[in-house]
Amino acid sequence: MTPSIGYVDEDENGQKSKFLRSSDDPYRLSIEEVIEKFETHLENGLSDEQAKSKLAKVGLNNLGADEKISISKILAHQIFNAMVLVLIISLIIALAIKDWISGGVIGFVVFINIFVGFIQELKAEKTMGSLRSLSSPMARALRNGVDSNINAEEVVPGDIIHIKVGDTIPADLRLVDCMNLETDEALLTGESLPVAKDHEEIYDYGAPIPVGDRLNMAFSSSIVAKGRGTGIVVATGLDTEIGKIAKSLKNNDDAVVVKVDKSLNPSTKDYLIAVIKTTKNIIFNVLGTNVGTPLQRKLSWLAILLFWVAVLFAIVVMASQEMRVNRNVAIYAICVALSMIPSSLVVVLTITMAIGAQVMVTKNVIVRKLDSLEALGGINDICSDKTGTLTMGKMIARKVWIPNVGSYLVQNSNEPFNPTVGDISFNENSPKFIKETDDELDFIPHLPSPTPILFEKWLHIATLANIASLNQIQNEMDGSIEWEAHGDATEIAINVFTTRLGYTRDKLIGDSLEHLNEFPFDSSIKRMSTVYKDKDGNSTVYTKGAVERVLSCCKYWYNPELTALSEEDKLLIESNMNALSSEGLRVLAFAQREINISKENVSNREVVESNLIFLGLIGIYDPPRPESAKSVKLCHKAGINVHMLTGDHPGTAKAIAQEVGILPHNLYHYREEVVKVMVMIANEFDSLSDDEIDNLPVLPLVIARCAPQTKVRMIEALHRRGKFVAMTGDGVNDSPSLKKADVGIAMGLNGSDVAKDASDIVLTDDNFASILNAIEEGRRMSSNIQKFVLQLLAENVAQALYLMIGLAFIDKSGYSVFPLSPVEVLWIIVVTSCFPAMGLGQEKASHDILEQPPNATIFTWEVIIDMIAYGFWMAVCCLVCFVCIVYGKGDGSLGENCNEGSDTGCNLVFRGRSGAFAAFTWCALLLAWECIHLRLSFFKMRPELENPWWKQLAIDLWDNQFLFWSVMGAIVSVFPVVYIPVINNKVFLHAPIGYEWGLAVAFTILFLIGAEGWKWFKRVYYRKSNANNPEYDLERNDPFKEYSSFSKSNTMEIV
């Protein structure tokens, strides 16, 4: 019975297009079944009526409507976060009680927070437009028996499409005919080489077939690299493989609305639970507690916590006044509440990240989403694509084996097209012997001299059975000489190798050789041959191709004399091929023979490619970037695990992973079941349930033949283990995982626009090493964020304690007099502290920042305790300063109505506020300098240097000039604020002072002494605790420790 085809009536995404639904996969069907299923005809195609009818059912062949930038959504995102909402509530209350000055200052702070965030997010906002640009604009379709070019959007299932070299495939095709057809699917599957197609292949229903292995299919947005073909359209729009990826990008995994599955006959209770969960999600989304990076979520929770603490303190204020709430009490309550809110934190954080993003541009990293920069500091797992990221994305000859001569090895070749770069070494043994021997066999750097005759014969084949070109050109910009190549990637690699040894086609042909014939590479035959005649009249056949296809044409080989090729000899050659393949190399064989053109027909391929003499093998591969191994090692040293998720074959993936250090070089020392977990094929991983994956003692380091969903599941598995994950990729197939990861990192040079749109960060040089630059900058920012969060929150703690204790100061009318006015509180929090906090955000990274473990959180116990300690000591110093002024030299008179204006009798209170304000300001500024290092003394932040303390202090302070001038400027700003008329007594509610300056300075110095004493205590404590485990660093920096330590009993069987 022929499988049926149906159409879904509704589009779950609200698009006009309707989805094709089939009961069987086209790649499992014969061509005849596909023709019948899609109601088409190979010779005539669809009729216009059929095409019109199907277009009405399935819709246009595109990926949906444009998503435009939503100004309102960006603005709402800035307003609806907990920190800003708390400030807005304070603003409303201040205006409600007609405290215009405080309300104006709070309003300005709210505006700055919203404006800065809005501008930054507007710049980063991207659309899905580039995804649609991948579609082929035109397609060559057969309709009504006539070939015609139609708009690709009008292609429908059942259309007969013709494709040729250079075409972008307009839809998913089931191939019905192809000639040497190869398609580049790197952006879709991650496969580094073009995929040879075979329309006659049919797959059974027994096992799942990854997209990259469906050789009878050609996929939408792939590019035809070689040959031509014809196919039946089996999927369009969002039903194509690329469409499925686009659909997954559009679907919001963190949907706010919880839907009820009506097919399960839900009860009223189910609907009620869904409503409760939806309401909870909406509230948490508005407050920002379940969106954004870990730091943003923690800050949102912090804002909520501080809001309720502020409410509690406000209630305490009112209770202390026996609930007699008048304007004075309300102002004091607002003042206490504001002292708990780090008003400048959001804007400082945003500006610091914006500056960090500008710095990253100089390090080949473009930050699309500022949030991700802070998030990089906490990354402890990187899932990386292979092709073009860890590797160069170009092919290089790695090894050559000539029987009875030995093996040649190419090393240090980091310029694929440059034959002058790199070293060739030699070993007289075969690849099989080198692999199997227990001895360390070194390759000697000197090649045999003179060149062995068999190697010379092989070089002639490699040079003449090759149509790739290699040329030197002059760079127009700087005049330097560069190498460029044209042709098949495999042939270019061989050409570069032979040119390296002085063998080029022009030199060999010259005036001595005549090209008689050529049989091009055919995907069904998998070999190519050329025939040349020399000036003596002798003709020679030169052949190269897939090992099994060349061996089938060979009758002889040299062992060491020319001898017949037996079955044992072929098995030996195949074992050497397997040895090269196990290293991740693509292996080709080479053969030749002399041909008598007077007796044999050189136009007959079967005749020419017979009775050949086998001469050797070559192994080529896409080599790792020179810096990849070092970068992976640094990642391990930084406590970051690196996983390779690639569409390539297992052998290639495993070999590259070992070469760059993702897998241990001594993999043979590990038990078989451990290696099975370390290296898995996507089908193995995908066959496991989430529970089975979670029960694995460790997650795989390498997964080969990855489909997009495999990468997403790997990231989800890491998330379930509490990991913070970065994902790198360049292809369309990487987009869902880039979006799913905590930080998505796309390639800028060769990456698809789709991947860039789904990413948070783009590498402009496609270099894995640049990820380390991003992580280093992320860690620097996380460290600096920790510093200014400590500075700002310690000030909040100090002000809250100061004002709460200040409730004890009761004036003549029985109301509390606040020892700092609301504007003084806001001035210290917003103006005085804001710029030094930005300065802390620009601190340079410590020299060992990549040798430290990832920053799991900003709010460590050390930071929390520091916050309380510094805040308490600052409050004590400033409160004692106020008391000394009012009750020491003063008579203790607190006047009346001093919270609103400078009435009679308020002079002493105003002078006390001025002294305390100066002390508070200067203590806060010194705290900024103290926060440069959480433990080291302010006077010796670099103990490894031998400079005198005063000289080193001057160097350290001047090193961050923004922070230096911010602190100095804020120190000086106290004087005009205290002395300028009207501003002092009407706005700040304080008065000019004299001897009180001395007290302010004295208590500032006392705060500095206390802070230094606290740091000294911490250094002693951590020195003792860190001395307990001297081998900790060695254990922490062993990336494979957990793989080598889990026992056989808790290892899961992988089948």
Swiss-Prot record:
It is found in: Cell membrane. Its EC number is 7.2.2.3. Residues 95-99, 320-328, 811-816, 888-913, 984-990 are extracellular. Induction: Induced by a combination of high pH and sodium ions. Pfam families: Cation_ATPase (PF13246), Cation_ATPase_C (PF00689), Cation_ATPase_N (PF00690), E1-E2_ATPase (PF00122), Hydrolase (PF00702). One of its GO terms (biological process) is sodium ion export across plasma membrane. Its cofactor is Mg(2+). The chain crosses the membrane at residues 74-94, 100-120, 299-319, 329-349, 790-810, 817-837, 867-887, 914-934, 963-983, 991-1011. Keywords: ATP-binding, Cell membrane, Ion transport, Magnesium, Membrane, Metal-binding, Nucleotide-binding, Potassium, Potassium transport, Sodium, Sodium transport, Translocase, Transmembrane, Transmembrane helix, Transport. Disruption phenotype: Reduces sodium efflux from cells. The rate of potassium efflux from the cell appears normal. PANTHER family: CALCIUM-TRANSPORTING ATPASE. Belongs to the cation transport ATPase (P-type) (TC 3.A.3) family. Type IID subfamily. Catalyzes the hydrolysis of ATP coupled with the export of sodium and potassium from the cell. May be an inefficient potassium exporter. May transport other cations such as lithium. Sodium/potassium efflux ATPases are involved in salt tolerance and maintaining the membrane potential across the plasma membrane in high salinity (Na+) or alkaline (K+) environments. This is Sodium/potassium exporting P-type ATPase 1. The gene is ENA1.
